[in-house]
From Swiss-Prot:
Top-rank taxon, per record: Bacteria
GO molecular function, one term: ribosome binding
Record's subunit section: Monomer.
Role noted for this protein: IF-3 binds to the 30S ribosomal subunit and shifts the equilibrium between 70S ribosomes and their 50S and 30S subunits in favor of the free subunits, thus enhancing the availability of 30S subunits on which protein synthesis initiation begins.
InterPro entries to which the protein is assigned, alphabetical: T_IF-3_C_sf, T_IF-3_N_sf, Translation_initiation_fac3_CS, Translation_initiation_fac_3, Translation_initiation_fac_3_C, Translation_initiation_fac_3_N
One of the protein's GO biological processes: ribosome disassembly
Keywords: Cytoplasm, Initiation factor, Protein biosynthesis
Protein name: Translation initiation factor IF-3
HAMAP family (alphabetical): IF_3 (MF_00080)
Protein biosynthesis in keyword set: yes
Lineage: Bacteria, Bacillati, Cyanobacteriota, Cyanophyceae, Oscillatoriophycideae
């Protein structure tokens, strides 16, 4: 069975939970009240019907602020949500083709790669060889170089064309 009671370490340090001999206190309007005892700071906070919240315990002495804790907690959660929204992980999208690709098909692949790059993703351009086609790796290298040239306005080559088994690949990343 899981113990549902939270330890005091997990709880936020507010009001009576602040256990330091002296703290630096900042008022709700941003002015400093100086270095006082937690009991005195708590009395000031209660007079204003607000909470005493520990902002930085690493400072010497620890810094506390008089504020509405519910509002503070809401703002912190809101900031975390915004940060999560803005966070974009660059995925690696793959564009596969053969070295004997037709012109229209090549243009479709270039447009596809361009879309991926504009979305902020990296692109792995892969050319697959079958059977004896591997003898024509120079043509595949030329095709990848052409693709890099066609995409130079939106991408930069992160990894030059190189052979890996029966494939030749090149990595492109979006320009900053």
């Amino acid at each position: 069975m899981i113990d549902k009671r939270r330890t005091t370490r997990d709880l936020p340090q507010i009001n009576e939970r602040i256990r330091f001999p002296e703290i630096r206190v900042i008022d709700s309007d941003g002015s400093q009240l100086g270095i006082i005892t937690p009991a005195e700071a708590l009395r000031v906070a209660e007079e204003k019907e607000l909470d005493l919240v520990l902002v930085s315990e690493t400072a010497s002495p620890p810094v506390c602020r008089i504020m509405d804790y519910g509002k503070y907690k809401f703002e912190q959660e809101k900031k975390a949500r915004e940060a999560k929204k803005k966070q974009h992980t660059a995925d690696i999208k793959e564009v596969k083709m053969r070295y004997k690709i037709d012109e229209h098909d090549y243009n479709v692949r270039v447009n596809q790669a361009q879309r991926f790059l504009k979305a902020g993703d990296k692109v792995k351009a892969t050319i697959t060889f079958r059977g004896r086609e591997i003898q024509h790796s120079n043509l595949a290298e030329e095709l990848l170089a052409r693709m890099a040239k066609d995409l130079q306005d939106v991408a930069e080559v992160q990894q030059a064309p190189k052979k890996e088994g029966r494939n030749m690949m090149m990595m492109l990343s979006p320009k900053k």
